[in-house]
Design a protein with these regions (language model features):
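Alpha-helical transmembrane bundles and membrane-interface segments of multipass inner-membrane proteins
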Residues: 1-178
Length: 178
């Protein structure tokens, strides 16, 4: 999550410093891909425009739920993808908190990646969408992969792998005999 937030904020800082104000043509990269500065007070695809504080509070709630849920995930790929989604949501939340706007949590999110056939977006938006879709695919089609850490017993102690009998574990373990 920290890497996503850092990259998101660095790219947004670059966009604000280097790109012309909203309404200019921007920088053409290739095909329909442009860098063009835009400020979004709503959510992805400009939904909820003018509802910055509500969007920010929803983001805080989603981040909190994802952090809470991540405690029960035992698959490294799932943890990484949840971290990517949390990083994206946190990156956009940082904009709402620290960029001038319309009062409490009313800052605008910096968007700058423009495709002529798609709404303008940023790295955080990409992390949320791509991470969320990848997480949904993994949760749907692949079983949990353990992180390598032993599961905890109800007492909080790591459980031993395999059955134990008389203090010896594994196949051919000693048994109590009369």
């Amino acid at each position: 999550a920290v890497v996503v937030v850092a990259l998101d904020q660095l790219t947004k800082h670059w966009a604000v410093a280097r790109l012309s104000p909203e309404g200019s043509s921007g920088i053409h990269l290739v095909g329909s891909l442009w860098f063009r500065l835009a400020f979004n007070s709503g959510m992805s695809f400009s939904l909820g425009t003018g509802m910055g504080p509500v969007v920010a509070l929803i983001a805080v709630a989603i981040i909190g739920v994802l952090v809470w849920l991540s405690r029960s995930i035992h698959s490294r790929p799932q943890l990484v993808l949840v971290g990517i989604v949390i990083g994206g949501a946190t990156g956009n939340l940082c904009d709402r908190l620290f960029r001038a706007g319309d009062g409490f949590l009313g800052g605008h999110v910096v968007d700058f990646v423009y495709l002529r056939w798609w709404p303008t977006f940023n790295l955080a938006d990409s992390a949320i969408v791509v991470g969320g879709i990848a997480l949904a695919v993994i949760l749907t089609f692949w079983p949990d992969e353990p992180t390598g850490e032993p599961p905890e017993s109800p007492t909080g102690e790591p459980e031993a792998s395999g059955a134990t009998t008389g203090g010896v574990s594994g196949v051919g373990a000693a048994t109590d005999r009369p």
